[in-house]
Amino acid sequence: VIIIAVLFLTACQLIATASYARSERKHPDLRLSSRNSKLSKRCLGSRELCVRDTSCCSMSCTNNICF
């Protein structure tokens, strides 16, 4: 019974991996755009409008202004 369960889980994993790889080949532009958006993120400089501390280079957002 354990052997059957392991074989079943392995087969499910292989099927999921194959469908993910197929999806990436069909839509390479989506993969590139998500990769580019991660690379183009930057922090906000001093006196720029902010929403949270993590968006500021100084990690200090007070009254929606980076310090």
Swiss-Prot record:
Residues 1-17 form the signal peptide. One of its GO terms (cellular component) is extracellular region. GO terms for molecular function: ion channel inhibitor activity; toxin activity. Keywords: Cleavage on pair of basic residues, Disulfide bond, Knottin, Secreted, Signal, Toxin. Its main location: secreted. Disulfide bonds join 43-57, 50-61, 56-66. The keyword Glycoprotein does not apply. Expressed by the venom duct. It is found in: Secreted. InterPro entries: Conotoxin. Residues 18-40 form a propeptide. The presence of a 'disulfide through disulfide knot' structurally defines this protein as a knottin. The cysteine framework is VI/VII (C-C-CC-C-C). Belongs to the conotoxin O1 superfamily. This is Conotoxin AbVIO.
